[in-house]
């Protein structure tokens, strides 16, 4: 992902606000609510019967944090996202059989939830930078698909 110096600064500044704990679970929860067919990958997570159950589900929140921790690692390696996410791409392709379109959908949810949490600090320029990164991460996660 090619980012300008300004974009890299915006990413680092906003990521430094420590919203990852809240944002990951909320983004994953919203994905599961808005795109209910994605729930099939999480049948071991317990009650996914309603929006309320999804948004308060401890396993959804924990997995969302895990996703954001991986995303955070990607922010450290923007020049090698495919290498950074290679093993996760293989896992999601070969073992979990996740439709790679779901990565793009989750990235969009992440941007929306960050905008909600960060308010006016999430400027249009910051949004554009995050859109570039989530698109790059989605592409990297889809890399091992045949």
From Swiss-Prot:
Its tissue distribution reads: Red blood cells.
* Cysteine-cysteine disulfides: none
Q: What residues bear S-nitrosocysteine in this entry?
A: 93
Which UniProt keyword terms apply here? Acetylation, Heme, Iron, Metal-binding, Oxygen transport, Phosphoprotein, S-nitrosylation, Transport
What InterPro entries does the record point to?
A: Globin, Globin-like_sf, Globin/Proto, Hemoglobin_b, Hemoglobin_oxygen_transport
Q: Name one GO molecular function term.
A: peroxidase activity
Segments forming domain Globin: 2-146
Read off the Pfam families from this record: Globin
PTM-bearing positions, type N-acetylvaline: 1
What highest taxon heads this organism's lineage? Answer: Eukaryota
Q: Which residues carry this modification: N6-acetyllysine?
A: 59, 82, 144
The keyword Transport belongs to this UniProt entry's keyword annotation: yes
- Phosphoserine found at: 44
Q: Which ranges of the sequence are coiled-coil?
A: none
Q: Which residues bind heme b?
A: 63, 92
Q: What does this protein do?
A: Involved in oxygen transport from the lung to the various peripheral tissues.
Give the UniProt family note.
Answer: Belongs to the globin family.
Q: How does it assemble?
A: Heterotetramer of two alpha chains and two beta chains.
Q: What is the official name of this protein in its record?
A: Hemoglobin subunit beta
